Amino acid sequence: YTLDDVFYMNMKNDVSCIIDNRMALMEHQSTWNPNMPFRGFRYAGELYNKYVVENDLDLNRRKLIMIPTPQYYVFYNGNEKRPEREILKLSDAFKVPVGEGCFEWTATVLNINYGCNKELMEKCSILEGYAIMVAKHQ
């Protein structure tokens, strides 16, 4: 599923799809933004709303409805030095600290700058080519 012409935070959505009951949301960032978990959370909410409507699911039933498992990835290639992989948590933005068992949403940020995440680049030559092109033009 993709959200046609859905805007959030003044940006158009990047890519989303459902494969093997997993809802993969992928976003590209060329500038560091600690609000990525919140952006992805909002985006996922829109996708789940669309999924419920398109599959004619009744949220008021007494039976648990099954939904795709979300996975949110951010591909980062900005100038700020960042680790190859980091997990950002939405709960870091909560005004009141949460305890165990409380809701959590994460963004898996993958640094796709040239020289980073070599295993990923070896598996995806298009991504590697993009990293090389960006490095040459920076």
Cite the ranges covered by each PLM segment.
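Elongated, amphipathic alpha-helical interaction scaffolds
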Residues: 1-138
